[in-house]
Design a protein with these regions (language model features):
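Hydrophobic beta-strand-centered segment that forms part of the acyl-chain substrate-binding groove
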Residues: 36-68
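Hydrophobic residues in beta-strands and at strand termini
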Residues: 9-11, 57, 103
Length: 114
């Protein structure tokens, strides 16, 4: 099914906060990466800018854990795509997210030379 994707990530020492667990921004980033990777299977483009990303943190994620993200496309329109996802450590639900992404149109290349 090209409208869903499962990815795994490792919660390393680099992701650890002062409480000794993975900081929330890492989980948000994992969802953003998974959603962004899913867009590649939905059309002929390699970039889909994030318009909105909402993450709910349900449980602390210990350092060393493997985080499994399961994401799916809810809608893929001409200009906007919507996604939902869940994150697990083992079988325990640790977070959820929803995201909105812009469907790419031909972008003008930013020219730094004048």
């Amino acid at each position: 099914d090209t409208k869903s994707l499962t990815m795994t990530f490792e919660a390393t020492k680099f992701h650890e906060n002062a409480f000794g667990i993975m900081f929330g921004g890492s989980l948000a980033g994992m969802f953003d990466i998974a959603f962004g990777t899913l867009t590649a299977g939905l059309g002929d483009y390699s970039v889909a800018p994030t318009v909105q990303l909402s993450t709910t943190f349900l449980k602390g994620i210990p350092t060393g854990a493997t985080v499994r993200t399961e994401v799916e496309a809810v809608s893929t329109g001409k200009t906007i795509m919507n996604f939902v996802g869940k994150a697990y450590v083992g079988e325990e639900l640790v977070g959820s997210a929803s995201g909105t992404f812009m469907t790419p149109r031909p972008f003008k290349k930013f020219n730094t030379e004048k």
